Every structure is written in structure tokens, then in C-alpha cells.
């Protein structure tokens, strides 16, 4: 395994693949991604969630044209309240993120609200690239959304079972998988490229709501 931070390693075969791995934080950091806990208050999370349920909000179902064996998610166009909550949270940490990755933010994509209902999941994927598979084996990633360099993911609730984020190609020194259990009000920031391909574990008990925006950087 190859160390990409003080605590996290990349699998050898993935690291050796020839695909874009920009940006990447210094390996002197404890972790190669950032987690900002309690960035959004419980009241703000509640206000954001209520804005989805308090109006005749029509979700854009992700299912038409997509393979539900890979992804079972509902995407909502964000409400005004959700946009306000996200932007306030993001600008609290913007400079820290830029310093951590040695980048400057450019334009971001449109905000998305991701809802995972009972049994909802998302199998391993990279946010800006498609898998290159040969003879049934992953051999690399091809960038298909170059405007996505960094992923900012904010969680609005945690009153459900499952729904963990696992980074498929990363491990701890002892070989354990890198799995993050989301907490309401926190934001996690990580590169959008193939090295940080990740999956969302199946959700049970309650619906899981998260807000995501991808950023181009230089």
C-alpha cells in the first residue's frame, strides 16, 4: 500500500493506474480528506429539511435511464433554504479547504439534494470519472466531468441506519477499510477523482438526506 496521509493508504494496484489524481493533499496530513463536524446547527438542518416537505416539492427521480442495481437515489432541486444553509456552511471552511489542498476554488456545479429512502444505496463510483474495465477487471478511470475536482458533501440528518460512506480504494495501515459514518450538520470534502471512488451503504429505518456540490479548482 502507498501512504497518501499519515493514517490512510491507497491500494497499490489503484495507485499505479494511469489516471488523473489531482488534487491530492500533502501526505503529511493526518487524513487525505476533511471532515468539519457541527458545521450546521440542528435547527438549521431541521429548517432545510422542512423546506423540502412543507411545499409541493417535486423530486427529480433518478431511475429513468439509470441502472438501479448501481444506484438507487432520489435527487431534489434545492430549495432557497437549503441553498442558504449550504452556502453559509461552505464559506466558513472555504479558506481551510483551499489551504489543505493547495488550490483555489473556481466555479461550482448546481447544488443537489440526495435522498436515500429505505434500501437506497450507491455502489462504488468516482464523482468525475467512469470506470475503465477490461476482462471484468478495473484498469483505470476516464474523466468525464472535468469540472468536478473537489466534492463538498453536507449531511442534513443521521437518524437512520446504514448510509456510511466507504472509500473503495483506501485502507488504514492495518488493512481496515476507510468507512465514514455521517453526522447531521457536518461536511466532508474530498477529491472527485478515481482514487477517492466511494460507495454509500444501504440505508434503513429512515430516509437519508445529503447536499452535494462539486467544484472546479486551480
Please give the residue ranges for each predicted region:
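Fe(II)/2-oxoglutarate oxygenase catalytic core
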Residues: 1-190, 194-218
